[in-house]
Amino acid sequence: VSGIQLSVNDMVRTGDWIVVQGTLANGVVIDITLITVKVQNFDNTIVTVPTYSLVTSSFQNWRGMEEGGGRRMTVNLNIDMDCVHFCTPDELEHLSSKVQVPAKGDHITNLELYRTYLATYIHRHPGINNNILTMVRYMDPTSTGLPVQIYCFTKNTSWAIYEGVKSQITDHAIASARDFGLKIFNWGE
């Protein structure tokens, strides 16, 4: 009965990437029978899961991500809040070559300009799907600084390509922080 429920409700298909909590299954479904689902994990091990456990418990199916046109990516960088300040006219002039400086007067912070710069950078990145939500936002401050979160979706859902895009964006965000007079929190300091 469980195998029929999986099929009729289109809960899982061969080729779906699934994660089953409480088991070692975290990979691609390679076979579905009435009583078992075989999953090939990313380390090439095979895990067999009873179909009833997929019907009676929750599991994560990544099919929606693969069909949805993007894989969600988040990067959090903790900014040392002691480095945040209002920009001087000289700083604004220098940074205007990197980012469009808003015409709102004297109260523009280096952090605001950095956030705007990153938002423009991810919007222009060829690996990012701009048809899905992209943003750069602040999270609640912590003892390690103010997290600046890059939130976007990669165009390609392949794990290796996703990690490549994420690395490019993370590298760029870390390297460009200094240009804005900002410092990323570092445990070693």
Model-derived features: positions:
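Transmembrane alpha-helix detector for multi-pass membrane proteins
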Residues: 1-5
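Soluble accessory domains appended to multi-pass membrane transport proteins
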Residues: 6-115
